């Protein structure tokens, strides 16, 4: 474990919004006087009607309720666009960089206002009203931002679905929130290849009947099927509307968006975020964590289909009047230098990406990085999963030339924004550590018996107090919200992550402790992959676990028991990978499949995943007691035929 410490560079301590003394003072106030602290921070957004109540929250069993600024009224789009028009109408709001390096666009705040109003008017003309749900299934093109902000402008609730998800996954998400409209494109572009988005929507809507309209953005000009009644081209509808659209006044606790995330039960959870607290927290974390100053060019490489794209491409930066970069492509297309060429092309100052991308680029060596300048960079960030110290060191040394601090940020879809992180002018850095809690965040590490651990320790990470960006419920299923997050440790929010706290009080995230795996920074419920495998006619049973993967952080390891009489073959293995890929999406494709005559089960029939994890990690020497299994002999068979052998 790395214990190398990097001091705060002197110029950072001088220039940053927050140095160490200021961090200590602000953090103490945020936990000792949360009402006063958050009342002041909430002034960073414009309120149509000011709030009088700051916090009204309860984590109590059977009474979990989270409300912030509840009697205030505001509009997110007005805060992200309209209020900036007086002073920065001609400043670039969004730099769009296409998949093809020859395509890029700069959109000013004035242009953003006009485009968002057009999209909002198109939706209003189709009878989309406050509270209606709109599913957005778009590539990383400016229209994705326009669509999200248009929904916010008129009070519709957006549900963005990542373009890599399959028609079945899309249908599930459309049905769960009963979307009235789907906004999509003819096709997407990614790494030089096309993605059949409209065809996927057509397939999804054969399974989901709730949708009235499908709005289609022209991206590639491909010939796609258009239903005469249901489908229409966005560019044609946009010609018929004006560039003025009044904002809908929203209560702070009115929903802003639903974002589906994998759960351990297999049914994706609709994480619900509301308006006021979310925007305050996204704006505040973006300013302090990235030390965003006027004039900075900021680039978060995420997709808007994930929460990082919501909070740190769109809402946080635009609330702060920032210039934010939106990238359609991938890190290695057309070459491994693409990220660094984009940084030089647009003079990016702040760069926020995932450890998966860093590890993949690290494998390509230093030369694709060092052949570019990167002189504009002053801060690097990491998000999505814990970053291993080796990748951190490479990122710091090669990409940042030992001059850019790294903010290694820990947070979740459910948290709305960053919760544990260094602040670049305040925090000494340890490679691999998320370091210290953000303002108002009270982490507690618990043992298996629900005792709070003090000092140096390892256990399960909980949060003792609410914060404004916290999710409010699982859409349509508050009982599941309480069960998932508040039942394991009553009175506390359980993150599902393991954590270590060191002697300096720094936090090190050790990974998921529930049945969710983190693949390339994206959460995938093992039950979802298992259900897909078992749906194959030749599979009788499946168990899925994570295992260490050099690039992705965690890979997907599947144990598959076949129907009687079915022979395990390489062709069947490939067929099962393709089956899951088609059913859920490429992100869920198993990396390793082990055909298993039987799975380790307790006498009550419960699969012992702990044992399967150890075998997948090639740690079979530490399996522990297997005598309680119904058939202990299964284990030696699995160990013998494991797919991930390092130790013979």
UniProtKB/Swiss-Prot annotation:
MF-aspect GO terms: acetate-CoA ligase activity; AMP binding; ATP binding; metal ion binding
EC code: 6.2.1.1
Catalytic activity line of the entry: acetate + ATP + CoA = acetyl-CoA + AMP + diphosphate
Gene3D superfamilies named among the record's database cross-references: 3.30.300.30, N-terminal domain of ligase-like (3.40.50.12780)
Highest taxon of the lineage: Bacteria
Residues bearing the modification N6-acetyllysine: 606
Chain sites annotated for binding ATP: 384-386, 408-413, 497, 512, 523
Protein's name according to its UniProt entry: Acetyl-coenzyme A synthetase
Organism annotation: Rhodopseudomonas palustris (strain BisA53)
């Amino acid at each position: 474990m790395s214990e190398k410490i990097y001091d705060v560079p002197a110029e950072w301590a001088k220039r940053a919004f927050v140095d160490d003394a200021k961090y200590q003072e602000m953090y103490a106030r945020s936990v000792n006087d949360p009402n006063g602290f958050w009342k002041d921070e909430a002034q960073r957004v414009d309120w149509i009607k000011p709030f009088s109540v700051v916090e009204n929250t309860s984590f109590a069993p059977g009474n979990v309720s989270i409300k912030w600024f509840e009697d205030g009224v505001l509009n997110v789009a007005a805060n992200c666009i309209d209020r900036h028009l007086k002073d920065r109408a001609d400043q670039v709001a969004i730099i769009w960089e296409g998949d093809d390096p020859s395509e890029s666009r700069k959109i000013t705040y004035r242009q953003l206002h006009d485009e968002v109003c057009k999209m909002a008017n198109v939706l209003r003309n189709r009878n989309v009203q406050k509270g209606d749900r709109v599913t957005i299934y778009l590539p990383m093109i400016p229209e994705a931002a326009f669509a999200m902000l248009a929904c916010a402008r008129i009070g519709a609730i957006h549900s963005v679905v990542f373009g890599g998800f399959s028609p079945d996954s899309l249908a599930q998400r459309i049905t769960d929130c009963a979307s009235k409209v789907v906004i999509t494109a003819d096709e997407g572009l990614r790494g030089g290849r096309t993605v059949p988005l409209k065809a996927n929507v057509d397939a999804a809507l054969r399974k989901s009947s709730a949708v009235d309209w499908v709005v289609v953005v022209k991206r590639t000009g491909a010939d796609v099927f258009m239903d005469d009644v249901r489908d229409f081209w966005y560019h044609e509808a946009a010609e018929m509307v004006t560039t003025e659209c009044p904002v809908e006044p929203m209560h702070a606790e009115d929903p802003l968006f639903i974002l589906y995330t994998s759960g351990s039960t297999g049914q994706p959870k609709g994480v619900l975020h509301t308006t006021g607290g979310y925007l305050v927290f996204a704006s505040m974390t973006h300013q302090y964590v990235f030390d965003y100053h006027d004039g900075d060019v900021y680039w978060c490489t995420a997709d808007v289909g994930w929460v990082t794209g919501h909070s740190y491409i769109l809402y946080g930066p635009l609330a702060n009047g920032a210039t934010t970069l939106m990238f359609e492509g991938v890190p290695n297309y057309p070459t491994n230098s693409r990220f660094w060429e984009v940084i030089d092309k647009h003079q990016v100052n702040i760069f926020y990406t995932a450890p998966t991308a860093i590890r993949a680029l690290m494998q390509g060596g230093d030369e694709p990085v060092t052949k570019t300048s990167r002189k504009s960079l002053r801060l690097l960030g990491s998000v999505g999963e814990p970053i291993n110290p080796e990748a951190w060191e490479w990122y710091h040394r090669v990409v940042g030339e030992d001059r850019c601090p790294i903010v290694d940020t820990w947070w979740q879809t459910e948290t709305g924004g960053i919760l544990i992180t260094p602040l670049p002018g305040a925090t000494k850095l340890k490679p691999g550590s998320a370091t210290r809690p953000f303002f108002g965040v009270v982490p507690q590490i618990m043992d298996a018996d629900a005792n709070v651990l003090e000092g140096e320790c390892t256990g399960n990470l909980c949060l003792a107090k609410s914060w404004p960006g916290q999710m409010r419920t699982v859409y349509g299923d508050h009982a599941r919200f309480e069960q998932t997050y508040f039942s394991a440790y009553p009175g506390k929010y359980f993150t599902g992550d393991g954590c270590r706290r060191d002697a300096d009080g720094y936090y090190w995230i050790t990974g998921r402790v529930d049945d969710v795996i983190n693949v390339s920074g994206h959460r995938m419920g093992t039950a979802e992959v298992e259900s897909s495998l078992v749906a194959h006619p030749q599979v009788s049973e499946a168990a899925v676990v994570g295992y260490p993967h050099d690039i992705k952080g965690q890979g997907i390891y599947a144990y598959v028991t076949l129907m009687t009489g079915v022979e395990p073959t390489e062709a069947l293995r490939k067929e099962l990978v393709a089956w899951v890929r088609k059913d859920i999406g490429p992100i869920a494709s198993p990396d390793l499949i082990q055909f298993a005559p039987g799975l380790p089960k307790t006498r009550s029939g419960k699969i012992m995943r702990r044992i399967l994890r150890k075998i997948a990690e090639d740690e079979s020497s530490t399996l522990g007691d297997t005598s309680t299994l119904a058939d202990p002999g299964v284990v030696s068979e699995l160990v013998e035929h494991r797919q991930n052998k390092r130790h013979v």
